[in-house]
Each structure stands twice: as structure tokens, then as C-alpha cells.
């Protein structure tokens, strides 16, 4: 492909200032890092280099290129039909966690292999642990209820020297449990993180994907791409959930996001001293009052809400701790002053 000069960089709205993906994608640089991306890159109707974000193969190859270019992860893949997350948004959560730790550490981000994170629902992609380990040197445990996700994540870790010794994978054997069976009695985590299932049923997940397809079709019409709009419309009748990727555990659970996080809060209260900051993404703003009430009921000492935005999408992190001020000081002196 003939190299095309990128247009002047433009910051993506709302991303964290340390997020390396805050500029427009430099496809020429990405292709140099990952030549396999080449056939997926073409000029769009505005004369910019881009990929077709409705094509799962293109999105997966873009992720592979981003992980190689920015995080020195050369070997990355996921099984067909598994969630292929947008890297910029995933990186944002990591950088906001770093800020959260810094606020508990006199403004200094704790870095290095003595800092331990736990990713609940790591998925086959292993993206949160990859970014956290490469950006800050943190060690991770990633858990999942799906055996193939664990197998895929292990393969990614074992296939990249840059991840050696940085990430462990644990299978959650009971799908009703979150921390139980994953956090052992002697485990110490400086933080946990989670992108919980959003929907309450397969029907709700399917409807959400159909809505996404309709929005893509409407945007394509608006931009004058009738051919692409027709393709989106056709895909709406062909298992839309699969068009965007994601297995059952990644997309939905009984009771949806609220029920999942309520369980997480309850289980975290059984392990108050195993972790400094428990955290989760909360996509639905209307779930916040019930979650705050649950955190009050389990006597969380401190609760923080961190707003995040990427373009039109707005979400937030809710983080909580059970450690007293004295325990927090002791934790900081023993673990973060190294």
C-alpha cells in the first residue's frame, strides 16, 4: 500500500492525558509495526486512512497492531466470536487506576512488579493486564469463568517475552462467584478492576447489538455511504451479537450489571484487608444509587466515583476500600514506598 500522509493530529475527546491513544491513529506507523494490517487499511470518504470498524477481522487486526506498536506485544490473537475490546478505552481505565493509587500515595503513582492488580473477567483478550503491566510494570492476576478465555490469555502471556512473569491466569470454577475462589487467604492486591456484563439476558444483549447496527447504518447514511449502510442493514438480520463479538459471560448475566456489581460488593466485604481499592466500571448511571447504598451497608470506609468519556460514550469507575486511615498509611509505607 502506498504511504499516505496523515492529516494533522486531533485529540480524541475525553481520554486520559497519559493515554497514548488520545491522538488519531497513525496507520502508517501501525502498518510498519504490523504489516498484516495493510489489507484492512484504506482511504475513507474524507480522504483519511482508516479501517472498516464494522468488520470484526479489521478491528482485531487493528488491536493486534496497537498492542504491538504501543506495548511491544508481538503475538496476540483471540478465538473467533470472543470480545475484541477497543484499546483506547481499556487504557483509560488503567491510567485512572494509576491516578487513584497516586491519590492514596501522596501524589506518586506506585509502579513496578511489587504492585498487584486483579482483573475480574479478563476475557480471552487479556487487554487490561497487558496494558497495566507494560505501562506501569504492575503484576496481574486475571480471572475468568470461561476455560477457553483462560487458555487464550495464557497463550498470549507465554508467547510474549515482554509479559514474562507479569500475568497469571485463574479459572473461576463457580460462575456465581466473583472474588470467592479467586482471592486466596494470603493474596494481597493493591487494586481490582472489572468491566462487568452489561445486559440481563441474551435477548437484551441481542437488542443492544441490533441497536448498534442501526446506529452504524444511520451514521453511514449521514456520511453519504449508502453501500455501507446497506451492508449494516443486512447484518442486522444475521446474528448481530456475533458481529461485535462476545460470549455469554462477557455480554450478559442474570440481573445484568447491577446484580453483578451487587454480588461483587458483598464478596469484597468478606475480604476487606486483601485489597486496598476494589473497583468496577459502571456503564448505567441509574445503577449508582443502589450501588452506593450497598457500599454503605457493607461499611465501605471510602467510595470514589471517577468519570470517564470517549467521544459520545460516558461511563465511570466506582472504587471503594474497607481500610481505615491507619491501615491505609501502613499499606502505603509497607508496599508503595519501595
Swiss-Prot record:
Segments crossing the lipid bilayer: none
Main location: cytoplasm
GO cellular component: cytoplasm
One Pfam family matching this protein: Methyltransf_10
InterPro entries assigned to the protein according to its UniProt record, in alphabetical order: METTL16/RlmF (IPR010286), rRNA_lsu_MeTfrase_F (IPR016909), SAM-dependent_MTases_sf (IPR029063)
Domain of life: Bacteria
Entry EC number(s): 2.1.1.181
A GO molecular function held by the record: 23S rRNA (adenine(1618)-N(6))-methyltransferase activity
Stretches the record annotates as Disordered: 1-21
Keyword line: Cytoplasm, Methyltransferase, rRNA processing, S-adenosyl-L-methionine, Transferase
Catalytic activity of the protein: adenosine(1618) in 23S rRNA + S-adenosyl-L-methionine = N(6)-methyladenosine(1618) in 23S rRNA + S-adenosyl-L-homocysteine + H(+)
UniProt-listed GO biological process terms: rRNA base methylation
Subcellular location: Cytoplasm
EC top class, as a word: transferase
Cited function: Specifically methylates the adenine in position 1618 of 23S rRNA.
NCBIfam families documented for this protein: PRK11727.1
Family listed: Belongs to the methyltransferase superfamily. METTL16/RlmF family.
Official protein name in the record: Ribosomal RNA large subunit methyltransferase F
Record organism: Photobacterium profundum (strain SS9)
Name of the gene encoding the protein in the UniProt record: rlmF
